């Protein structure tokens, strides 16, 4: 009976049957229904999360970030062009927060692209060196940081072998 619902739930029959065998009917239906829900958009703001929460019709998260459940192009949202916020999953914002107060400190962000954590650190007053192996992703990081109005040193390099010229206060590595 549940397998007959698979097309209605926008889940391919073969996938639904696989889940059904692995998880049972109740969990399979829950997974299928969850896949049909609109994904939330998490944002990190440079400042004034309460104010931006109202402007963006977003919920303020315990991490200090925002979550929107409405859709539309992000470039059309208030504050995008001004660099007031950037897209960053709430969980992805946690590693930078764990460094504590980084104001005035030098921080290397390894595997840095697309730049959400580097932006967090820059917004908190750190001097950033962003290192990433992918030239294409590094170009995106530089573009993102430019839109946000943050400066940093961009290094195209391998986190496994690159070494800084000088000691720094902290290194952030949230490797893929």
What function would you assign to each model-found segment?
Residues 1-176:
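S-adenosylmethionine
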